[in-house]
């Protein structure tokens, strides 16, 4: 890879200098409050800048990592080499008739609220999902009986060559916590949702109910990575973990939540290594006790810390 100072000069010639940060600590951008530094942390505000960065990185063989709002991800303390592209500044939300077009970095909660404000129904389920639009499409996020595939019209993505590709709902191949975005290593830049006219009092009542249920059941008072495991067929991950007597089990500063066994919370300056070790322990115990494999929903990226 090129020297850091050479990459910096190249980037300054490609994109606005004020969106470039060098050796940027990533823990401030994740819900777990863990993670080392990024060699380069870039915050583009336009799709064209994303394309320019991706094409440059491809040409120079520099690895690229994308970050949304860091709600369902663990970044290791060794940090991330190459370029990290933050999508948070791609945060426009435009409403027209029964459609909403939102940038990848928009919070899906804010899109849900925009739908409510325009008396549109269909996104109430997302009122408590902490992720970004890009992350929500990436994993077909869902909650309380609704999921992204129920309401998305299309997504505009960028591929590893820096080309823009638009995918319809069907072409996105949205499945349980999966999509073509994952399979083809794409990144969502924008998504459009088609909703239905509703009644404001009914929309608000549903959102209030879902918010209350979320706040009463989830450990929102601590840093966490959200739901750690996918739902195994025929089971609930949280119930299996609870029945394995693992609630409150701690590795370092991270423990299985006493409030909801499907969550792991950072209660005392925990590290990404603590999270990983705890995840492996829980997987091992549940496998031994119930012969059920727990697969991670949370993404783990970055390098392990040097010894």
UniProtKB/Swiss-Prot annotation:
GO terms for cellular component: cytosol. One of its GO terms (biological process) is regulation of cell shape. Pathway: Cell wall biogenesis; peptidoglycan biosynthesis. One of its GO terms (molecular function) is UDP-N-acetylmuramate dehydrogenase activity. It catalyses: UDP-N-acetyl-alpha-D-muramate + NADP(+) = UDP-N-acetyl-3-O-(1-carboxyvinyl)-alpha-D-glucosamine + NADPH + H(+). It holds the Pfam family FAD_binding_4. Keywords: Cell cycle, Cell division, Cell shape, Cell wall biogenesis/degradation, Cytoplasm, FAD, Flavoprotein, NADP, Oxidoreductase, Peptidoglycan synthesis. Signal peptide: none annotated. Its main location: cytoplasm. The active site is at 177, 227 (proton donor), 297. Its cofactor is FAD. It is an enzyme of class 1 (oxidoreductase). The keyword Nucleotide-binding does not apply. Belongs to the MurB family. HAMAP family: MurB. This is UDP-N-acetylenolpyruvoylglucosamine reductase.
